């Protein structure tokens, strides 16, 4: 029975599930994690990398061995698995959680179909990466990130505390809220911004016939502010459909906002135009800089360097000597409102700060942030 108590079934062996597993292993080395994934390649990799200890033959066969179930799959598949659990006939108690980006539909369904001996705590670790797959999993992925917990109507407080203890190796900041509040907050700061980014890209694409140079000049700041439009189309289709009501509310607000600024422009209302941008600037400048949020952060450093051969290799050699890893490096051709022509992206703010100090000390180039 003790073996079952210390066994966790992880369904979904991608970046998020794999990172949770590594964090649990770090803090609870006695736990046994068995895994299952729709991709045999991911399951084999997870076992080889030590992310899991064993593979399950099926979802339900894995649940039969475990006391805790972590469902790290898209929301649609999570709902399918909850239904399988409801009809499994498994008699022992279970602690169940998920990692989905929307919570109301999942938590409501869990309340509806699961027996009381199965305690479900909705979960949403608000951190990610620009990489995917179990090979990109890191035990520190959620460090200092918000990890939202959304208990259901039938969830005991003890189950929430039990889950927090299991996940404390993530070093995340746990925040409890209702599923409805979660979906409202994320619709504002994550879901709707993805729609806006995608719509800006569509607008640019449609403008190419009229302005053929649009694509070339969009390589600078425009590309930066629309980065999130490169996210998984399938994932964002599902997120919007599962958070439909909140998203429709955001559309209504956005239409009112656009109508307002359009009126200011139409009427050449300089005072209100200034106030509009000043209010936005002040609010954005007051947002936390170092707290991880719902959208993966980009830790970019801009380096003002002369345009001559060998500059990029000089910079990368400095960083390599200090063992500072970079995720991307590129030259910015369109530099309106951006200081510097070389942009280097890092995995963390600490790496960016170290790089800034090294470059300014050893190469005497001026560096800037555009946060």
Swiss-Prot record:
Top-level EC class as recorded in UniProt = oxidoreductase
What keywords sit in the KW lines?
A: Amino-acid biosynthesis, Aromatic amino acid biosynthesis, NAD, Oxidoreductase, Tyrosine biosynthesis
InterPro entries, alphabetized? 6-PGluconate_DH-like_C_sf (IPR008927), ACT-like_dom_sf (IPR045865), ACT_dom (IPR002912), NAD(P)-bd_dom_sf (IPR036291), PDH_C (IPR046825), PDH_N (IPR046826), Preph/Arog_dehydrog (IPR050812), Prephen_DH (IPR003099)
Q: Where is the ACT domain?
A: 300-371
Q: In which pathway does it act?
A: Amino-acid biosynthesis; L-tyrosine biosynthesis; (4-hydroxyphenyl)pyruvate from prephenate (NAD(+) route): step 1/1
Binding-site residues, NAD(+): 7-37
Keyword NAD among record annotations: yes
Q: Which reaction does it catalyse?
A: prephenate + NAD(+) = 3-(4-hydroxyphenyl)pyruvate + CO2 + NADH
Q: Which EC number(s) does the record attach to this protein?
A: 1.3.1.12
What biological process terms from GO does the record include?
tyrosine biosynthetic process
Q: Which residues form the Prephenate/arogenate dehydrogenase domain?
A: 6-295
Q: Which GO terms describe its molecular function?
A: NAD+ binding; prephenate dehydrogenase (NAD+) activity; prephenate dehydrogenase (NADP+) activity
Q: Which NCBIfam families match?
A: PRK06545.1-5
Family indicated by similarity: Belongs to the prephenate/arogenate dehydrogenase family.
What is the protein's given name?
Prephenate dehydrogenase
Q: Please report the organism this UniProt entry assigns to the protein.
A: Bacillus subtilis (strain 168)
Q: What is the lineage of its organism?
A: Bacteria, Bacillati, Bacillota, Bacilli, Bacillales
Gene it is expressed from: tyrA
């Amino acid at each position: 029975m003790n073996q079952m108590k210390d066994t966790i079934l992880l369904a979904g062996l991608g970046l998020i599930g794999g990172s949770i597993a590594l964090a649990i292993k770090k803090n609870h080395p006695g736990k046994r994690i068995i895994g299952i994934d729709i991709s045999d390649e991911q399951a084999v990799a997870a076992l080889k990398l030590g992310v899991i200890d064993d593979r399950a033959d099926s979802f339900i066969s894995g649940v039969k061995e475990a006391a805790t179930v972590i469902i790290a799959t898209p929301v649609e598949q999570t709902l399918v698995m909850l239904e399988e659990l409801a009809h499994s006939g498994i008699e022992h108690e279970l602690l169940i959680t998920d990692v989905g980006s929307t919570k109301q539909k999942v938590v409501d369904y869990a309340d509806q179909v699961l027996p009381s001996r199965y305690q479900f705590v909705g979960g949403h670790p608000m951190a990610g990466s620009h990489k995917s797959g179990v090979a990109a999993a890191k035990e520190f992925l959620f460090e200092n990130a918000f990890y939202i917990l959304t208990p259901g109507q039938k969830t005991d407080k003890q189950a929430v505390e039990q889950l927090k203890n299991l996940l404390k190796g993530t070093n995340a900041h746990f925040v409890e809220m209702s599923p409805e509040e979660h979906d409202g907050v994320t619709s504002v700061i994550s879901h709707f911004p993805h729609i806006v980014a995608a719509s800006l890209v569509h607008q640019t694409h449609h403008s190419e016939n009229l302005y053929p140079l649009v694509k070339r000049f969009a390589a600078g700041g425009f590309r930066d502010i629309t980065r999130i439009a490169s996210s998984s189309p399938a994932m964002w289709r599902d997120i919007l459909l599962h958070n439909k009501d909140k998203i429709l509310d955001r559309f209504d607000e956005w239409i009112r906002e656009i109508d307002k600024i359009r009126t200011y422009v139409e009427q050449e209302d300089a005072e209100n135009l200034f106030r509009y941008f000043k209010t936005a600037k002040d609010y954005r400048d007051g947002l936390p800089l170092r707290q991880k949020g719902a959208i993966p952060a980009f830790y970019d450093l801009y380096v003002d360097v002369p345009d001559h051969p060998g500059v990029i290799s000089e910079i990368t050699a400095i960083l390599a000597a200090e063992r500072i890893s970079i995720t991307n490096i590129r030259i910015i051709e369109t530099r309106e409102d951006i200081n510097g022509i070389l942009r280097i992206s890092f995995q963390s703010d600490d790496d960016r700060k170290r790089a800034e100090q090294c470059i300014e000390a050893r190469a005497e180039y001026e560096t800037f942030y555009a946060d």
